[in-house]
């Protein structure tokens, strides 16, 4: 639940703050926002599809168990989330859009993999509760970050806040690796 709590602020930031960010920080008018603001969501759709294929691909190519392949996929997506963390470092609004697209793709890939881990790690009669708890934690994280973003965007700007988004997913991946390590070891010992 903690990795999802740290990942969800990215999606809520993308969903609710991109147009305001593009207008205030990047000086885009409504016509330019309409031309570009949809792109991170298309990239997110592709990330959602990729999330379903990446772990079986990793398992097949590298010969690792499915749960380990999902965790590796989460790690790869978390590394890609560094891109939106660097938005404040680029001068061009078009590069900012590219970084938002990478972030949308990475977040949805990561989100699919974290949700799927609930089914991999819990008995069938507990999956719904586990996934509900993970989703609740995610939305709490998103709510808290949205409150902070609304409070601090005018004083510190969006750049540092986007930076936190990149760091949050890396921290979440490390926490996931730490807590799921024993489950992966037990699964691999059982299958050996």
Where are these regions (language model features)?
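Interfacial helix-cap and linker-helix signal at transmembrane-aqueous boundaries
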Residues: 22-23, 54-55, 59, 149-157
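Cytoplasmic loop-to-transmembrane helix junctions
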Residues: 32, 66-69, 126-133
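A membrane-interface helix-boundary motif in multi-pass transporters
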Residues: 29, 69-72, 151-168
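A late C-terminal transmembrane helix in Major Facilitator Superfamily
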Residues: 48, 119-156
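C-terminal transmembrane helical hairpin of 12-TM major facilitator-type secondary transporters
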Residues: 67-114
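Extracytoplasmic gate region of multi-pass secondary transporters
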Residues: 1-51, 107, 111-115
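Multi-pass alpha-helical transporter architecture, strongest
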Residues: 82-89, 166-192
């Amino acid at each position: 639940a903690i990795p999802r709590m740290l990942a969800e602020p990215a999606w809520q930031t993308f969903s609710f703050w991109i147009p305001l960010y593009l207008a205030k920080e990047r000086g885009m008018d409504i016509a330019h926002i309409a031309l570009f603001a949809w792109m991170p969501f298309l990239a997110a759709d592709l990330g959602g599809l990729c999330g379903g294929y990446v772990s079986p691909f990793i398992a097949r190519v590298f010969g690792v168990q499915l749960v380990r392949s999902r965790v590796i996929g989460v790690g790869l997506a978390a590394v890609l989330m560094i891109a939106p963390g660097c938005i404040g470092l680029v001068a061009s609004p078009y590069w900012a859009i590219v970084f938002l697209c990478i972030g949308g793709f990475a977040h949805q890939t990561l989100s699919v993999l974290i949700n799927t881990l609930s089914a991999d790690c819990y008995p069938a009669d507990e999956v719904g509760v586990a996934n509900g708890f993970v989703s609740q934690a995610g939305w709490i994280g998103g709510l808290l970050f949205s409150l902070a973003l609304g409070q601090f965007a005018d004083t510190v700007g969006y750049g540092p806040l986007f930076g936190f988004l990149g760091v949050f997913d890396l921290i979440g991946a490390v926490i996931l690796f730490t807590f799921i390590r024993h489950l992966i070891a037990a699964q691999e010992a059982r299958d050996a």
